[in-house]
Amino acid sequence: MAEENQVENSEAAQQSPEFAIQRIYTKDVSFETPNSPAVFQLDWKPEIQLDLDTRSTKLADNTYEVVLSVTVTATVEDKTAFLAEVQQAGIFTIGNLPEAQLAHTIGAFCPTTLFPYARETVASLVNRGSFPQFNLTPVNFEGLYASYVQQRATQENVAQSSETH
């Protein structure tokens, strides 16, 4: 009976979801102030553009690299004040998940984990460029991922309906 419990426990352990952060690191970083020092003389009322992107690569069974790219462009009076680009990456162990849940974890949960690191790097770069304090507002990666899934489903439905006509 003890052997039966051990077999059941080991089977349950094999089937339970697995998630671990192996490493978080800065993959690439760039900061440009193409119009300095003239931009420092302008009235500081910047227009901020934020671009986000994620990509993932399967490294091995249950091991994935997820890269969150954050690009922030500040423009003052039609002049680029600064351009900050950060690629924050992580290596994650993710196992025993259904395909949809795996895609959700890679597309939403991992970027949510990486974002605070990218946010800190961007804030530091902007500060070192001697610009006023800048903090990225939190990003709802769950909502972005849900929109992405819905958009793909719509595109697939359109493609299928055009194939039948």
From Swiss-Prot:
It comes from the Bacteria. InterPro entries: SecB (IPR003708), SecB-like_sf (IPR035958). The keyword Transport applies. Keywords: Chaperone, Cytoplasm, Protein transport, Translocation, Transport. GO terms for molecular function: unfolded protein binding. GO terms for biological process: protein folding; protein tetramerization; protein transport. GO terms for cellular component: cytoplasm. SUPFAM superfamilies: SecB-like (SSF54611). It is found in: Cytoplasm. Pfam families: SecB (PF02556). Its main location: cytoplasm. NCBIfam families: PRK05751.1-4, secB. Belongs to the SecB family. Homotetramer, a dimer of dimers. One homotetramer interacts with 1 SecA dimer. One of the proteins required for the normal export of preproteins out of the cell cytoplasm. It is a molecular chaperone that binds to a subset of precursor proteins, maintaining them in a translocation-competent state. It also specifically binds to its receptor SecA. This is Protein-export protein SecB. It comes from Colwellia psychrerythraea (strain 34H / ATCC BAA-681). The lineage of its organism: Bacteria, Pseudomonadati, Pseudomonadota, Gammaproteobacteria, Alteromonadales. The gene is secB.
